[in-house]
Amino acid sequence: MFPRVSMRRRSAEVSPTEPMEKGNGKNQTNRICLLVALSLFFWALLLYFHFVVLGTSNIDKQLQLQPSYAQSQPSSVSLRVDKFPIEPHAAPSKPPPKEPLVTIDKPILPPAPVANSSSTFKPPRIVESGKKQEFSFIRALKTVDNKSDPCGGKYIYVHNLPSKFNEDMLRDCKKLSLWTNMCKFTTNAGLGPPLENVEGVFSDEGWYATNQFAVDVIFSNRMKQYKCLTNDSSLAAAIFVPFYAGFDIARYLWGYNISRRDAASLELVDWLMKRPEWDIMRGKDHFLVAGRITWDFRRLSEEETDWGNKLLFLPAAKNMSMLVVESSPWNANDFGIPYPTYFHPAKDSEVFEWQDRMRNLERKWLFSFAGAPRPDNPKSIRGQIIDQCRNSNVGKLLECDFGESKCHAPSSIMQMFQSSLFCLQPQGDSYTRRSAFDSMLAGCIPVFFHPGSAYTQYTWHLPKNYTTYSVFIPEDDVRKRNISIEERLLQIPAKQVKIMRENVINLIPRLIYADPRSELETQKDAFDVSVQAVIDKVTRLRKNMIEGRTEYDYFVEENSWKYALLEEGQREAGGHVWDPFFSKPKPGEDGSSDGNGGTTISADAAKNSWKSEQRDKTQ
């Protein structure tokens, strides 16, 4: 039985190692839990110390550093910085600042944002006080101060227009005029065929049979030689639009509807307004050239019978400056430039030689006139002028009429002008005549009868004091036969005549267009004078925009002709002795009923000028 008892006892006993093994398993588990708890507690203390204690200390240091940075800067600018949405740290002793307005010397850049694909980062809005508004043309203005840059303040940016606005017209040159084959006049960069010096009237070089309406292509080709062209429009003092506006309208003035006449102008404006360069000043720094009178571009209505196109009445075009051979006295967006003459020198020496020759000529005629009467125009004084020339022993007349005439030969015209002390320049079909520039090129003192023929037209190229180079006889004095032109001119002392003639000869360089394939070195030609005038105009406008002022007080566009005559410092145009010459007729006084009598008359004059072109064509 013992063995059985022993066996039962054994089964009831526990091995001495068994409780130890069980106890060891529990102790091991407890140790692991304790180590994990200690580790978590340690890292919690470490993180708390780093982010709370050290973080608060760094913020305090940054706040203490900001005043010293501000004090180190020379100027003070107040700015408002919009706050970022950030989570504040749990630091009860340091609540987040409530005031977003900070006064510092220079803007403090915000911290770099964390990239977030779900939203677009927007930097803080900074509104500066005490500082003038920034304009996109500031960089161009600053080039003037760069004394090491010979082109500083003179850069021109040229739009790269589609060829339909210029070169394509030349390829289709037979359609440029209804009566004249313009193809030969577009040769030699727009100068036309060379003139032979058979009669010794011209010099041996630089003379061409130039069409009076060829300025479009001459000017554009001359621009290609301009020394200060730039491809960076932000540097440009002005922006040139090489649109052949005169050639364009010449194609469609007769026999085409207004839609066709307006098409190219509308397309041009649409093209320009889509360009980034337009946004700089909304076109106020843009300029273009048209070798025709302004009335070809100022159609007043949508009537098919009305004359010309409406380029200069388009809102966008009103911002641009258009250079024309005759401008409107009542509008502010066009400016007169000289008609082209026959002389286009390639070198300064050619200019000097011609001037010396004009000084030494013997002039046997007191006065002369080249032209035809205007029997259809009751206000024209040409008939009286022709009569006075015929009845004078010291007057010379070169009659121009239909058919063959010496008046159509450049050598005959220039020879007469070279033989005269004074050259009579009444109005043509419109205010101006090419003849005025041909005569001054010959050293002949011009006699004008209307201020719109020169004095209010070519203010960039002619002296403001017109008495230094010309004689003015009011039209009414001739029309009412109150004056003898011969007696009036004989009253001028010989010494004064000599001074006036010298002044005219000195003006020659700025009245002619140099050969577009070259450039004069020391002399400024009509192109140079025109470009500089445009740059000056744009520069004044930009400076006025920065200063928040206007150039004139109470500007009245209908009195545009007066402003160029103001003395420096004058800001308002009042009454003028020439007001009667530019007063618009009231409705009905000129046969019109639209209240635009003066413009209507000028449009009729434009039509007549085309008839004269048919008569005076040189083929």
UniProtKB/Swiss-Prot annotation:
Disruption phenotype: Stunted growth. Disulfide bonds: none annotated. Its EC number is 2.4.1.-. It comes from the Eukaryota. Changing S470L: In mur3-1; altered xyloglucan, but normal endomembrane organization. In mur3-5 and cie1; stunted growth. GO terms for biological process: endomembrane system organization; fucose biosynthetic process; protein glycosylation; salicylic acid mediated signaling pathway; unidimensional cell growth; xyloglucan biosynthetic process. GO terms for molecular function: glycosyltransferase activity. Residues 1-33 are cytoplasmic. Keywords: Glycoprotein, Glycosyltransferase, Golgi apparatus, Membrane, Signal-anchor, Stress response, Transferase, Transmembrane, Transmembrane helix. InterPro entries: Exostosin, Exostosin_GT47. Glycans are attached at N116, N146, N231, N257, N319, N465, N482. GO terms for cellular component: endosome; Golgi apparatus; Golgi cisterna membrane; Golgi membrane; Golgi trans cisterna; trans-Golgi network. Residues 1-26, 576-619 are annotated as: Disordered. Interacts with CSLC4 and FUT1. Involved in the attachment of the Gal residue on the third xylosyl unit within the XXXG core structure of xyloglucan, the principal glycan that interlaces the cellulose microfibrils in plant cell wall. Associates with other xyloglucan-synthesizing enzymes to form multiprotein complexes for xyloglucan synthesis in the Golgi. Interacts with actin and is required for the proper endomembrane organization and for the cell elongation. Not involved in the trafficking from the endoplasmic reticulum to the vacuoles. Involved in salt stress tolerance. This is Xyloglucan galactosyltransferase MUR3. It comes from Arabidopsis thaliana.
